Regions:
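Acidic, surface-exposed loops and disordered segments
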Residues: 1-195
Length: 195
């Protein structure tokens, strides 16, 4: 899939007041209840393309994304919590799809960046995962980031290679319902400073 023909980086033709991307960002929310329908192939294809076109340090794309649809594997992942009762992630079982971002911290490039205390493999994988989240929202899907999971256990479940690491998980599916209201956000002056 190539960039759309109407793709135009000419800033003089863009109307900032009508940002389609910002509208999608505002619509995205953490969905924890899904319908049982599987995510169809056309939607999966767009999510896969979002991974491919995501930026990464030096365009190395140092990750592999696992699209997990097997119900038993999803249940196993939901049980793999680092601490406390597994019931904290019970909601994950309703998702028809879990996307697992697997980073490659052992690549020479990433080992070199450790001198500056930067985990590029994680940063790159999370950027690509956010691209999935946004296109999924545009396609009428719900998503939720899952940070409370046991990396090594999930890595074993997914049979990832030695030297790789499960960076982050995301549930994806058709929402059971839409939220009745949006969660409040901080004021811009609490979040952004110009210097």
């Amino acid at each position: 899939m190539n960039p759309p023909k109407e793709f135009n980086m000419d800033s003089t033709t863009v109307d900032p007041a009508n940002s389609r991307v910002l509208e999608i960002i505002k619509k995205r929310y953490s969905c924890r209840r899904y319908r049982s329908d599987q995510v169809d192939d056309p939607r999966l294809d767009v999510m896969k393309e979002a991974v491919r076109w995501a930026p990464s340090a030096c365009n190395r794309q140092p990750y592999l994304f696992n699209f997990v649809t097997d119900e038993n594997t999803i249940k196993e992942i939901a049980q793999s919590v680092p601490l406390g009762p597994a019931s904290v992630n019970e909601w994950i079982k309703s998702a028809p799809l879990i996307v697992a971002a697997v980073g490659q911290p052992e690549l020479l490039w990433h080992k070199m960046t450790q001198v500056i205390d930067t985990d590029y493999h994680r940063t790159d994988a999370i950027i690509a995962m956010d691209h999935i989240s946004l296109v999924a929202t545009e396609l009428g899907l719900g998503t939720c980031w899952v940070g409370w999971f046991h990396r090594k256990k999930v890595g074993k479940i997914l049979k990832i290679k030695s030297g790789e690491e499960v960076v982050i998980l995301m549930t994806v599916g058709f929402p059971e319902s839409q939220p009745s209201s949006r969660k409040p956000r901080k004021e811009l002056d609490e979040l952004i400073v110009f210097k």
